[in-house]
Amino acid sequence: MLFFSYFSFRDYYLTKLLLLILLCEMILPISAGLVFKEDFENIGELEDNWEIQGVNWKLSSKYNRSPNGYNSLRLAPTQLGVWQQMWQTVNYSKPFHLRIWFYERGWGNRVKVDQQYLFIGDNKTFDSSKKKCQIGQSGHKDYEGFYVIFDGLNARKSQSISDRERWVSFEFVIDDDGTAMIKIDDSVEITLVEKWETVGSIGLGVFGRKDRGGTTDAYWDHLEIFDTVGIPNLALERKNCLTTTWSKLRMN
């Protein structure tokens, strides 16, 4: 009886140790390379991280994309005909990978703004940046059913289509040699002409208009920044057993 109890006790703790090792093996690839995460769940953190410039914002429970999350960021203009935005001044070098999620409601419910965009610049402000890009949605008829990508001042229609309700990922990637690319829905849309060395500013902005149909607000969620080119997909699986650990991870 004592012999049996000894081995049962030993096997119990060996099993726990093996499970712990397996969990660590699974978690490390997820967290490796993550340097910033904004899941738009905490008002205090959001106000600390972002400079708000006139835009109407709130944390909304209408949609959510973050693991174990409840809210997303709702942005809307407070007046028409002016840019309103929220910004972060940052200092990241290549390699760099940013991913954020935009809630697509279909073209019939498109945003009623000239531009509702993610902005990225290589200097402390977007206006002072020599290299800049934008990814987002426009109510302009020329972009009906698609997204809009700006490489500097040059606009182009996306290959990805805005055809149905879903979360869409917008990504900006700089690889080890400075080659920069924009991805939508995990597909490369464009490789930028100029090489990028750094990212100095990121922002989300709106420009309201009254001459286009659609809705006035837009929803964003789960911004991640990595100092690696390749990033994990596992972190966004809501039902994964690791989401609790992932949702608590925050690195500045």
What kind of feature is each model-predicted range?
Residues 166-181:
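Localized edge beta-strand/strand-to-loop motifs within extracellular or lumenal beta-rich domains
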Residues 44-75, 80, 127:
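Extracellular glycan-recognition surfaces and repeat-rich motifs
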Residues 75-144:
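Secretory/extracellular carbohydrate-interaction modules
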Residues 148-169:
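Short, aromatic/His-centered strand-loop micro-motif at the edge of beta-sheets
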Residues 31-54, 238-247:
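Extracellular carbohydrate-recognition regions
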Residues 40, 221-225:
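Extracellular beta-strand elements of beta-rich domains used
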Residues 1-15:
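N-terminal secretory signal peptides that target proteins for export/translocation
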Residues 192-221:
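Flexible glycan-contacting loops in extracellular carbohydrate-active proteins
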